Amino acid sequence: MSAQPVDIQIFGRSLRVNCPPDQRDALNQAADDLNQRLQDLKERTRVTNTEQLVFIAALNISYELAQEKAKTRDYAASMEQRIRMLQQTIEQALLERGRITEKTNQNFE
């Protein structure tokens, strides 16, 4: 699928971007989210310069992305540790079962 031009509105400005057809809804949702963020920033900060608002929003989004990446790394590390613990538990159980089986077999001989 090739990208097709899509017109979106960002803070009152029209912008044409190329987007694959199957990602058009996601693009529109992202544009809506950005518009809402810019509007909220404008109200909270009383900054009226659109360029400045865009930079502040970009910094906020970059910070949020960095936070989410850190959470993902922490979660992945936690899952790796849990998997290692489960593997050790399973290996230990199999070893113990093997020992019990060996003892049982020796008793029957």
From Swiss-Prot:
Which keywords does this chain's UniProt record carry?
Cell cycle, Cell division, Coiled coil, Cytoplasm, Septation
Q: Name one Pfam family in it.
A: ZapA
Classify the main location.
Answer: cytoplasm
- Where would you find this protein in the cell? Cytoplasm
Can you list the GO cellular component terms from the UniProt entry? cell division site; cell septum; cytosol; plasma membrane
Record-linked InterPro entries = Cell_div_ZapA-like, Cell_div_ZapA-like_sf, Cell_div_ZapA_eubact, Cell_div_ZapA_N
Coiled-coil annotation reads 21-100
Asked whether the UniProt record includes Protein transport among its keywords, one would answer no
One GO biological process term is:
septin ring assembly
Q: Family, per the entry?
A: Belongs to the ZapA family. Type 1 subfamily.
| The protein's role, per its UniProt record | Activator of cell division through the inhibition of FtsZ GTPase activity, therefore promoting FtsZ assembly into bundles of protofilaments necessary for the formation of the division Z ring. It is recruited early at mid-cell but it is not essential for cell division.
Q: Tell me how this protein assembles.
A: Homodimer. Interacts with FtsZ.
NCBIfam families named in the record? PRK10972.1
Q: Can you say what this protein is called?
A: Cell division protein ZapA
State the organism named in the record: Shigella dysenteriae serotype 1 (strain Sd197)
Q: Which gene encodes it?
A: zapA
